[in-house]
């Protein structure tokens, strides 16, 4: 064999080892042991092979394919395997290494052949098959099925995720259709409980068990404390004597429990319903009866039972609905629905919150509506025909300059002329004559007709003072015991009026300083009733008050301003004997603020300002360790212990002279101030003198108030009367 032949044999042997049986061109030999092999023919330069049908149609570019079946791995090489020197190589390699040529899944059909030279497929007779579409192997179809399945699964997942996301977004941002629990909204506790809406406010009790109203025999009844707080505070209920009162300018309206009849001053009247019902000590007043004495309208609605009351009149904002919509408990689509409103319904606008407006419906729902559901808001004036009772007053045609005269015993009355001898410009003197002797309403009286005569001769009116201390009772509890009974108040008033008329005085000055918060409603009822008696008897009625503070609001300054002829603000005792720190009796700022606050409740024509004619000398020492440990409450916040002594103007000046101290002007407090060390501590004093008094008189004049009152006669320096005269006509 020549050299070329050797090389060719070596190449063929190598290929045989790699791919299986190989035949040279022109050879008719067949490899022994081959099962299912084809016939190898040679026609000229073209070699035709009858081989596995599974290879038909495979692209000449395919290099290999891997299938897995029953754990067996197969490798295939396409029919377009390399040809060198006209040799056609076709083989199968099983991972096990033996080429059997046996038919497997996709085994070749007999007579199939492939042509390598031309790239055209032919049949067994050499007919071209290029026009026939090639078949795909099962593995290719499986891959496509898997690919399609993956696509479908992906799309399904996208749809599911989208649906879940949509549900989440809807639940989070979509409008809630849930209805609010109206029984909870209105605070209804029992079947006969009546919900109450007053002036666009849902009224609930202080706790869950407090019933604000009841529907009884077809009539709405409102609980007494709710009536006082939200509708008309002039109604008064006495649980001790089971009587309800309403004070008119000339007398009381009185109603007994369970009755259709009532008395208006002296006239007997009746209704066709029971006016007052009770459960224990709790009273319920029929709303139609309340309406007789109150400027109000009301409407009753069902499901749930509720009554809508309007007692405030004036300008309001209203708007008409553009479309049907819901009123929600709060602003936002996730808030529960209170009620549904229709297109063209009118609502009252209470608050504007951009996208939502707080509104009140005519039937008593207070909630929120989308702004875009409302037409433009308009102003509307509301009113109701009603004649308010006129509580007439006595108004003196002069500026009041009243001085309190502290009278502790009958003998003190004899010094009245000496007491007023050095005064100038006084219009009124107020002796402390009347005190409550006991808890039955009896009084102690120091009234003297001689005193009155002396005062009248000096052109002074006499307004006798009635106090709830110094003379019998002297505690909050005792004052409450007297004022909380209608019969005891009546006894007290009748005795005072009788003593006043007997002595010939000109007025009553009420000075009750032991009124607790619990006693407030009884105290103001006493003021009403006493004002009626003073009005009927031509007596000037004035009432003394502390400087207005949040803790003494139960004195009802506004109601006093209606009932009384004059309201006096005692603008002193800023610091008292019981104070934990030293300070002024009446600094400028204290008096100024007191005037401002009082004017919020009382007309300036009725307001009189009390000023001090005294001061306090303070002595301040550091607390010992034992005293610090023993301190309780507010006292624990102060490191020093203080004591004080009240004294008049002249005595204060004498103290300064004895100490060799010069007081300096404090422009903040607008009074002279001094301090010095002695006796192991520090003395401090804020002087009340002509200079400080003038600053207070300027406030009174600038605010055009009714006048001034001084506490007390005998503590003043005589020079102050000329000063006061400049500010009092």
What are these regions (language model features)?
Residues 1-140:
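N-terminal targeting leaders characterized by basic, low-complexity, disordered sequences
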Residues 3-13, 145-353, 382-395:
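Primary recognition of N-terminal secretory signal peptides and signal-anchoring hydrophobic helices
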Residues 246, 344, 357-361, 369:
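SH3/SH3-like beta-barrel fold
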Residues 379-495:
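Glycan-recognition patch characteristic of GH18 chitinases/ENGases
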Residues 382-384, 471-472, 615-696, 728:
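Glycan-binding loop/region signatures in secreted carbohydrate-active enzymes
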Residues 429, 510, 567, 609, ...:
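Conserved, mostly hydrophobic/aromatic
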Residues 433, 491-522, 569-574, 578, ...:
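Active-site groove signature of glycoside hydrolases
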Residues 439-446, 494, 517-654:
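Substrate-binding surface in catalytic domains of secreted glycosidases
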């Amino acid at each position: 064999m020549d050299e070329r032949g050797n090389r060719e044999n070596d190449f063929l042997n190598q290929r045989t080892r790699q791919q299986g049986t190989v035949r040279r061109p022109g050879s008719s030999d067949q490899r022994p042991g081959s099962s299912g092999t084809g016939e190898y023919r040679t026609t000229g330069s073209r070699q035709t092979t009858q081989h596995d049908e599974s290879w038909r149609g495979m692209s000449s570019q395919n290099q290999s394919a891997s299938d897995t079946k029953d754990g067996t791995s197969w490798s295939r090489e396409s029919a377009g395997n390399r040809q060198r020197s006209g040799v056609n190589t076709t083989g199968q390699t099983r991972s096990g290494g033996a080429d059997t040529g046996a038919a497997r899944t996709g085994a070749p059909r007999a007579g199939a052949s492939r042509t390598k030279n031309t790239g055209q497929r032919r049949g067994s007779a050499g007919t071209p098959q290029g026009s026939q579409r090639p078949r795909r192997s099962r593995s290719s179809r499986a891959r496509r099925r898997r690919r399609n399945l993956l696509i479908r699964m992906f799309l399904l997942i996208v749809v599911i995720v989208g649906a879940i996301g949509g549900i989440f977004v809807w639940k989070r941002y979509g409008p809630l259709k849930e209805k609010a629990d109206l029984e909870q909204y209105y605070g209804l506790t029992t079947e006969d409980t009546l919900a109450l809406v007053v002036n666009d406010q849902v009224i609930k009790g202080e706790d869950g068990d407090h019933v604000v109203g009841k529907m009884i025999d077809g009539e709405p009844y409102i609980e007494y404390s709710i009536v006082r707080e939200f509708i008309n505070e002039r109604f008064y209920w006495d649980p001790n004597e089971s009587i309800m009162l309403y004070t008119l300018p000339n007398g009381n309206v009185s109603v007994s429990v369970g009755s259709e009849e009532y008395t208006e001053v002296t006239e007997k009247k009746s209704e066709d319903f029971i006016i007052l019902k009770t459960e224990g000590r709790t009273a319920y007043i029929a709303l139609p009866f309340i309406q007789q004495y109150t400027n109000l309208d009301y409407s009753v609605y069902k499901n749930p039972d509720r009554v809508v009351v309007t007692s405030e009149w004036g300008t309001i904002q209203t708007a008409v609905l553009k479309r049907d919509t819901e009123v929600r408990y709060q602003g936002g689509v996730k808030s529960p629905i209170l009620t549904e409103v229709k297109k063209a319904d009118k609502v009252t606008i209470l608050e504007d919150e951009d996208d939502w407006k707080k509104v009140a419906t005519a039937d008593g729902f207070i909630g929120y509506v989308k702004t875009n559901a409302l037409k433009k808001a308009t102003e509307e004036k509301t009113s109701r025909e009603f004649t308010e009772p006129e509580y007439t007053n006595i108004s003196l045609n002069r500026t009041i300059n009243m001085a309190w005269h502290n009278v502790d015993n009958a003998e003190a009355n004899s010094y009245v002329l000496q007491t007023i001898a050095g005064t100038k410009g006084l219009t009124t003197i107020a002796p402390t004559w009347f005190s409550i002797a006991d808890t039955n309403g009896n009084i102690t009286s120091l009234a003297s007709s001689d005193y009155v005569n002396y005062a009248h001769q000096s052109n002074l009116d006499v307004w006798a003072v009635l106090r709830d201390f110094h003379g019998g009772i002297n505690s909050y509890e005792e004052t409450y015991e007297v004022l909380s009974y209608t019969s005891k108040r009546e006894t007290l008033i009748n005795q005072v009026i009788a003593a006043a008329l007997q002595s010939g005085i000109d007025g009553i000055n009420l000075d009750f300083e032991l009124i607790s918060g619990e006693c407030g409603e009884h105290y103001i009822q006493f003021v009403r009733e006493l004002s009626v008696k003073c009005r009927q008897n031509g007596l000037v009625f004035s009432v003394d008050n502390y400087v207005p503070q949040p803790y003494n609001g139960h004195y009802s300054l506004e109601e006093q301003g209606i009932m009384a002829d004059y309201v006096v603000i005692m603008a002193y005792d800023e610091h008292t004997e019981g104070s934990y720190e030293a300070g002024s009796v009446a600094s400028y700022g204290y008096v100024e603020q007191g005037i401002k606050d009082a004017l919020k409740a009382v007309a300036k024509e009725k307001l009189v300002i009390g000023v001090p004619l005294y001061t306090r000398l303070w002595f301040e020492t550091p607390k010992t360790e034992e005293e610090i440990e023993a301190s309780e409450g507010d006292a624990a916040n102060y490191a020093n212990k203080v004591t004080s002594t009240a004294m008049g103007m002249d005595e204060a000046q004498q103290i300064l002279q004895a100490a060799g101290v010069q007081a300096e002007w404090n422009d903040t407090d607008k009074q002279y101030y001094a301090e010095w060390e002695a006796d192991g501590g520090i003395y401090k004093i804020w002087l009340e003198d002509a200079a400080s008094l003038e600053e207070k008189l300027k406030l009174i004049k600038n605010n055009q108030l009714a006048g001034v009152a001084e506490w007390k006669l005998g503590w003043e320096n005589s020079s102050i009367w000329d000063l006061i005269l400049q500010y009092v006509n």
